[in-house]
Amino acid sequence: MSRIELGGVLGKTFGKVHHRLISRVSEAGVALAKTVPGFEQFMISSQRRGLTYSVFKGKKNIGVDDLGFPVTGDVIRIVPVIIGSKKAGVLQTILGAVLVAVGVVLNFTPWAAASPFFYKLGAAVMLGGVVQMLSPQPAGLASKQSSDNRASYAFGGVTNTAAQGYPVPLLYGRRRIGGAIISAGIYVEDQQ
């Protein structure tokens, strides 16, 4: 018997701990869908409500590739996660709220003329933090997986590597910075 723990709204709705006889991690959701009334419909409709799920085997968060592995006695935990949530941007949002609070406090001091500056700065920093939390950037070239994945200097830039999905900079005047190559091709021509 494998122990399956449900977290968050799943645990509140369907019970926190379940025991099922399963051989692979991927069978946990199927076993609960067949034996717990309403579980399958809840899982199907959860994406519309802005939820996705993380599966933990023991303390390790596993991916889709690891779901087919056999159960080795570890506890399987299924935890709901809000779609689009991540850790980046939380500190920025808190810093923005602090700046707005500083602006409110400055209203009652001799430096009241500076309070609109703190309101605007705090609101901009908060908005930037919220946008950063809701729209994650693609990993792309930030995650260097091999030693061959290095910056290229072939087209005259400082570093002209860019990942898919990033904006293309528009520059007027002389270029002294790295650039993003939109399209390039190299072909070999026989020389005789």
Curated annotation (Swiss-Prot):
GO terms for biological process: viral tail assembly. The keyword Ion transport does not apply. Keywords: Host cytoplasm, Late protein, Viral release from host cell, Viral tail assembly. One of its GO terms (cellular component) is host cell cytoplasm. Its main location: host cell. It is found in: Host cytoplasm. Plays a role in tail tip complex assembly. The tail tip complex is assembled successively with three tail tip proteins J, one tail tip protein I, one tail tip protein L and one tail tip protein K. The tail tip complex interacts with tail measure protein to initiate tail tube assembly. The formation of the tail tip complex is completed by the addition of tail tip protein M, which is followed by tail tube polymerization. May be excluded form tail tip during maturation and would be absent from virions. Belongs to the lambda-like tail tip protein I family. This is Tail tip assembly protein I. The gene is gene 20.
